[in-house]
Amino acid sequence: MTLSVYWPRDEYPEAVEVLQRRLSSDVQLHWGSAPPDRCDVLIAGRPDRDQLTASPDLQALVIPFAGVPMSTRATLADFPDLRVHNLHHNAASTAEMAVALLLATAKRLLPFDRALRADDWRPRYEDFTASMLLDGKRALVLGYGAIGQRIARVLNALGLRVTAVCRHPERHPDAADAGVDLRSTRELDDLWAQADALLIALPQTPATEGLVGASELQRMPDHAVLVNVGRGPVVDQAALYEALCDGKLGGAGIDVWYNYPSDPEERANTPPAAYPFGELANVVMSPHRAGGGDAVEARRMAELAELLNALARGQTEAQRVDLSAGY
């Protein structure tokens, strides 16, 4: 039987055409504003109730990016029999951004760049020890999914001693072979003091929101660096701002935030947080762009096609989301 798939998007027809070419003959893709009469699979990141109830044949929702938005989780609570799947096409680009933010923060690239653009060499002589040597330092990676695993491998190659945390370490028996000391989230309280570099690759769920607060930051070594490519609210923004201001943290590289523009008109003047992180010289700011890149959309289409083809073959567990966990 043909799998009927509906993607209610009108933009980027070239990408949809790429997807169409990769689909097997038993997948029928409908896209645009007009839904088909029958729909087995809906592709939408933030579906509304009308979309979820339009077809009595709907079996699955595919979220075409990593993670599950909190608003979508709330909506799906009323659809307990609906399977949910998502994609991890952006794992490489997000991990690369995490490492870039770590290096830029640890090496204080931006303040020195700004000074030399003004022909000012003084910081080189006045602050010669400003850079953190990462080789031999201890890194703590929160989250050991597709992104966290890539981050851990690169950190290991840079000479850091890597500890990572996840809910089910038993599912990753090869972590030790990759040079990663993988621990359970139950052990996290004992690990903050070992985090010269803290890298966050966690989704936002009720269990992770506010996970890194004032107490956790105070237990980290003095002048540690923090990188967040997961979700902003995993870190308490007030505690983070204070730790950066008083020097407890040496710096932070942040790609994910607390406040986003709600429409195109707001994109030129929306503060990303309730605190002025942009005034701090020890912060590297990125506007939630870790998942982007020149080849990422092509990878999205390739992975989406692979998932839809798997669903058409009856592989209903492919990239399935556990909504009780939030990922």
Predicted regions and their residues:
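Rossmann-like dinucleotide/phosphate-binding beta-alpha-beta segment
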Residues: 129-222
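Alpha-helix C-terminal capping/helix-to-coil transition sites in glycosyltransferase folds
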Residues: 37-38, 57, 193-194, 219-222, ...
